[in-house]
């Protein structure tokens, strides 16, 4: 079985959960006894064992959605000879769709997010958002199977695309490598990042995008006790305007309280893991989140999580056992910020309870979210799709 994996992100150019997912899924698939043969195709220059596909020269100044389609055309041509194509995110869905039409091979999509649920992407793509939405819809309706990364995501897929046969939409959870993400206490690393390891702190890790809800967290921080810290590991802004909004809010917060640190970078794992481990609480204020792999990473590091109760997050954060959930209502941002502040304050004031939740979170990761099981389940979807074509 020869599988063509298509992804926009591939190490070292990984900036979001979808890229992390593809990296670990490919490694786990390759580790399976008698597993499939994989050809990885990524956007950009060739790297590692992936075939890179830079944006075609005539499209270098074009809208980002047109650049993606130009790259997808080249990838689709390179997929001749695959038995099945598996694409990740709308950026790559076009390549899978074209390969399916031109080469007659089945196409499997992993749903990491849905364009209609992310209208703010129009700020990044402009008119290209209409093309990204059309690409996703067309690819999903034509796909042989759709893999949702959570039960909540499956419900979302069927709600947004009701024409899809529910039997074609499968749940295969996202995962985390518990060896790569494990409790690592290193006050020196934390201090080297400008964070006081002796001050209890809440930690946010994520991209600067409307989806991640960072402005809500900054509003909540105004209500936190004065003796605790807030660390924001946030970069890769969708737009300059979003970055500036965060910069202004952080500067205002830093002027009013101590212990607010903004690390404007996506840290390497050897720095990120000690930073997560050292936090009393990890906070995920997302307003939209199909699963939230970052919450699994925090749990694997033994850190309690406070998160919004949206999308697939409640399937990852066991409320009251591995963390605390906060209801999100788009019409009540002040209430959401107050809820975040209250739950964060609970755990920051009770480090023993937070530590117990963190230990329970790691235990759950070890039992339910390993990559070997995810890879096995993915190959079962491949086999079922290929059998249906015979």
Predicted regions located by residue number:
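Nucleotide-activated donor-binding/catalytic signature segment of Leloir-type glycosyltransferases, i.e.
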Residues: 243-266, 270
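Carbohydrate-associated surface elements
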Residues: 152, 175
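Short hydrophobic beta-strand element within catalytic cores of glycosyltransferases
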Residues: 281, 304-307, 317
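N-terminal subdomain of nucleotide-sugar transferases
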Residues: 1-47, 372, 389-390
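Glycosyltransferase donor-sugar binding loop
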Residues: 44-46, 176, 229-247, 261
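Short alpha-helical donor nucleotide-sugar binding micro-motif in glycosyltransferases
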Residues: 274-279
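Aromatic "clamp/platform" in nucleotide-sugar-dependent glycosyltransferases that forms part
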Residues: 287
């Amino acid at each position: 079985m020869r599988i063509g994996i298509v992804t926009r992100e591939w190490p070292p150019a990984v900036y979001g959960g979808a890229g992390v997912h593809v990296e670990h899924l490919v490694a786990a698939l390759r580790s399976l006894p008698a597993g499939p043969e994989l050809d990885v195709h990524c956007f950009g220059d060739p790297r590692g064992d992936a075939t890179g596909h830079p944006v075609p020269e005539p499209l270098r100044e074009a809208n980002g959605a047109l650049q993606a389609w130009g790259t997808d055309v080249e990838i689709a041509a390179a997929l001749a000879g695959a038995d099945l194509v598996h694409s990740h995110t709308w950026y790559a869905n076009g390549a899978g769709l074209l390969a399916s039409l031109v080469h007659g091979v089945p196409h499997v999509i992993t749903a990491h997010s849905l364009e209609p649920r992310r209208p703010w992407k129009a700020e990044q793509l402009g008119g290209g958002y209409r093309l990204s939405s059309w690409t996703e819809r067309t690819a999903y309706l034509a796909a042989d199977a759709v893999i949702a990364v959570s039960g909540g995501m499956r419900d979302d897929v069927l709600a947004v695309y009701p024409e899809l046969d529910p039997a074609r939409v499968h749940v295969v959870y996202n995962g985390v490598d518990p060896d790569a993400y494990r409790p690592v206490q290193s006050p020196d690393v934390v201090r080297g990042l400008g964070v006081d390891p002796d001050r209890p702190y809440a930690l946010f890790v994520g991209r600067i995008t409307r989806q991640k809800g960072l402005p809500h967290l900054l509003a909540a921080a105004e209500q936190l006790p004065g003796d605790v810290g807030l660390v924001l590991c946030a970069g890769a802004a969708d737009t300059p305007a979003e970055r500036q909004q965060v910069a202004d809010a952080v500067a205002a917060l830093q002027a009013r309280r101590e212990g607010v640190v903004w690390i404007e970078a996506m840290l390497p794992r050897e720095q990120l893991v000690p930073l997560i481990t050292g936090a009393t609480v990890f906070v995920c204020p997302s307003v939209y989140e199909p699963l939230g792999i970052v919450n699994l990473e925090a749990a694997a590091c033994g850190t309690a999580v406070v998160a919004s109760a949206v999308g697939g997050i409640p399937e990852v954060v066991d409320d009251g056992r591995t963390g605390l959930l906060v209801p999100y209502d788009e019409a009540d941002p002040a209430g959401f910020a107050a809820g975040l502040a209250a739950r964060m304050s609970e755990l920051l004031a009770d480090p023993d309870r937070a530590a117990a939740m963190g230990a329970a979170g790691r235990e759950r990761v070890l039992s339910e979210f390993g990559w070997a099981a995810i890879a096995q389940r993915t190959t079962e979807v491949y086999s079922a799709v290929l059998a249906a074509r015979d």
